[in-house]
């Protein structure tokens, strides 16, 4: 029986491989679904410099795997923000968003940021 940790690791590796070739042709900020089941939701996001993702929220915590790292500003709908420095090939933990808040991801660097996001559907 596959443990949840092994499953997430396997899923992450598969998403990384599937998304890598696609990233080479992306010309705008985009979010592309990769996989979803009752346990996880996985997508790839490519965020171009100064071309933020629309306001959105995350009900569940998530792991960010940086395919192409950079400096990401996460700004909520009240204007508060935090800066994340993501290194290529590294994974990062982000908690779920506080109730009733929205945020947007803004690449404040000079090169596209590409990440795989693994959102844990059963965690709060």
Please tell me what each predicted stretch does:
Residues 50-54, 90-105:
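Histidine-centered metal-chelating micro-motifs
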Residues 9-19:
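Bacterial N-terminal signal peptides
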Residues 29-54, 59-64, 115-118:
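A short glycine-rich, His/Asp/Glu-containing loop-to-beta-strand
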Residues 98-121:
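Ligand-binding loop in jelly-roll beta-barrel domains
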Residues 1-11:
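Bacterial N-terminal signal peptides that target proteins for export
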Residues 36-39, 79-97:
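Short acidic-glycine-tyrosine-enriched beta hairpin
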Residues 21-23:
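Boundary at the C-terminal end of the N-terminal hydrophobic targeting segment
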Residues 58-78:
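Glycine- and acidic-residue-biased ligand/ion/polar-headgroup-sensing regions
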């Amino acid at each position: 029986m596959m443990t949840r940790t092994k499953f997430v690791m396997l899923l992450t590796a598969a998403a990384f491989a599937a998304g890598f070739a696609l990233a080479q042709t992306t010309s705008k900020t985009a979010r592309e679904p990769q996989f979803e089941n009752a346990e996880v939701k996985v997508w790839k996001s490519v965020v171009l410099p100064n071309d933020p993702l629309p306001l959105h929220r995350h009900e569940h915590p998530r792991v960010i795997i940086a395919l192409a790292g950079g400096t990401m500003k996460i700004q909520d709908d009240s204007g508060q923000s935090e800066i994340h420095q993501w290194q290529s090939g590294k994974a990062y933990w982000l908690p779920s968003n506080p109730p009733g808040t929205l945020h947007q991801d803004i690449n404040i660097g000079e090169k596209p940021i590409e990440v795989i996001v693994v959102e844990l559907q059963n965690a709060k």
